[in-house]
């Protein structure tokens, strides 16, 4: 799909990998009769989500100089994502993840990264011109786990911020990748006060606050003065939003979920694409609620197919879905 050249650029930083998804839901990895190869990785999913919706996006990260790595770069290009920020590592493989799909479409992960190419991105390999051209710079926390990628992440954030980009953060907690829960929490929170938009899931809210109450009081313990929008996604219960001046909830759409992979990324991509050229939406509750309803629809549609990227909807698909609701 051709990207809209007039739109502001959304640059997504981090990992892209291959998810191996069982062909049968509700079985363990050992019992799975076969696996479907599905490209994924939250930051890459967000970049493709933006492009599918008619926006402009670029991906910054490192892939293995192997068949899987070149396949993933090709998928980004095919989906209209700028690939000038991609590096290839000749010494490390592209990351793999085996995903267990429970009967309700939710997931558990087993990762193969020892180390994978994405972990080896160095600050001197960053395409700084591309990063400086971002109107929105989006990232997760997996790139904070080890050096040198952590330093590359911090440098990219700093360069984007100095150039005037809006910083967007989705921690995308994957506990098995961290040395410990304490380290995960420390590192996720180490860059917390830099982001102007933060999206967490209900599970991440519980993890970061230590509270099992998913309510406004708990969510607002994560508020910081630089924030423009804090979002808590509640899966089949919709989402909650918090700004400096207002807060509220947006109802979900009920669909037959088969795989929740990529739903949060689809939600984030939709949100960023709607605000990249008009940040005033963040200060207008009525308009923000419309944007979040659209984002909820994107997330819901994404759960109705297996794999993240194949399931990310186009703008026309979302509008058609909303017309029927």
From Swiss-Prot:
<keyword id="KW-0808">Transferase</keyword>
<dbReference type="InterPro" id="IPR002173">
    <property type="entry name" value="Carboh/pur_kinase_PfkB_CS"/>
</dbReference>
<dbReference type="GO" id="GO:0005829">
    <property type="term" value="C:cytosol"/>
</dbReference>
<dbReference type="GO" id="GO:0019252">
    <property type="term" value="P:starch biosynthetic process"/>
</dbReference>
<dbReference type="GO" id="GO:0005777">
    <property type="term" value="C:peroxisome"/>
</dbReference>
<dbReference type="GO" id="GO:0005886">
    <property type="term" value="C:plasma membrane"/>
</dbReference>
<dbReference type="InterPro" id="IPR029056">
    <property type="entry name" value="Ribokinase-like"/>
</dbReference>
<keyword id="KW-0547">Nucleotide-binding</keyword>
<dbReference type="InterPro" id="IPR002139">
    <property type="entry name" value="Ribo/fructo_kinase"/>
</dbReference>
<keyword id="KW-0418">Kinase</keyword>
<dbReference type="InterPro" id="IPR050306">
    <property type="entry name" value="PfkB_Carbo_kinase"/>
</dbReference>
<comment type="similarity">
    <text>Belongs to the carbohydrate kinase PfkB family.</text>
</comment>
<dbReference type="InterPro" id="IPR011611">
    <property type="entry name" value="PfkB_dom"/>
</dbReference>
<comment type="pathway">
    <text>Glycan biosynthesis; starch biosynthesis.</text>
</comment>
<keyword id="KW-0067">ATP-binding</keyword>
<protein>
    <recommendedName>
        <fullName>Probable fructokinase-1</fullName>
        <ecNumber>2.7.1.4</ecNumber>
    </recommendedName>
</protein>
<keyword id="KW-0119">Carbohydrate metabolism</keyword>
<dbReference type="GO" id="GO:0008865">
    <property type="term" value="F:fructokinase activity"/>
</dbReference>
<dbReference type="Pfam" id="PF00294">
    <property type="entry name" value="PfkB"/>
</dbReference>
<dbReference type="GO" id="GO:0005524">
    <property type="term" value="F:ATP binding"/>
</dbReference>
<comment type="function">
    <text>May play an important role in maintaining the flux of carbon towards starch formation.</text>
</comment>
<dbReference type="GO" id="GO:0006000">
    <property type="term" value="P:fructose metabolic process"/>
</dbReference>
């Amino acid at each position: 799909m051709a990207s809209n050249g007039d739109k502001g650029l959304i640059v997504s930083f981090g990992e892209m990998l291959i998810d191996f998804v069982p062909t049968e839901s509700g079985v363990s990895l050992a019992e799975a009769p076969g696996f479907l190869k599905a490209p994924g990785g939250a930051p890459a999913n967000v970049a493709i989500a933006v492009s599918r919706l008619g926006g402009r996006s670029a991906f910054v990260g490192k892939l293995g100089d192997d068949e899987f790595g070149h396949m993933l770069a090709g998928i980004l290009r095919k989906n209209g994502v700028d690939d000038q920020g991609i590096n290839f590592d000749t010494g490390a493989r592209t990351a793999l993840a085996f995903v267990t799909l429970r009967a309700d479409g939710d997931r558990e992960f087993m990762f193969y990264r020892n180390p994978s190419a994405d972990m080896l991105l160095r600050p001197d390999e960053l395409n700084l011109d591309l990063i400086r051209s971002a109107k929105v710079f989006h990232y997760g926390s997996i790139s904070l786990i080890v050096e040198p990628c952590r330093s590359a992440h911090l440098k990219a954030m700093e360069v984007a911020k100095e150039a005037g980009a809006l910083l967007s953060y989705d921690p995308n907690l994957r506990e098995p990748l961290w040395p410990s829960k304490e380290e995960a929490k420390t590192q996720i929170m180490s860059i917390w006060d830099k982001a102007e938009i933060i999206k967490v899931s209900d599970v991440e809210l519980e993890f970061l606050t230590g509270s099992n109450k998913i309510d406004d009081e708990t969510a607002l313990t994560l508020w910081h003065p630089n924030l423009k929008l804090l979002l808590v996604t509640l899966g089949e219960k919709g989402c909650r939003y918090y700004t400096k001046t207002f807060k509220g909830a947006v109802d979900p759409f009920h669909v037959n979920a088969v795989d929740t992979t990529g739903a949060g990324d689809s939600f984030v991509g939709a949100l960023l694409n709607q605000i990249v050229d008009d940040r005033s939406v963040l200060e207008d509750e009525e308009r923000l609620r419309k944007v979040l309803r659209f984002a909820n629809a994107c997330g819901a549609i994404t759960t109705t197919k297996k794999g993240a990227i194949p399931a990310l909807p186009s703008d026309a698909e979302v509008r058609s879905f909303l017309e029927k609701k």
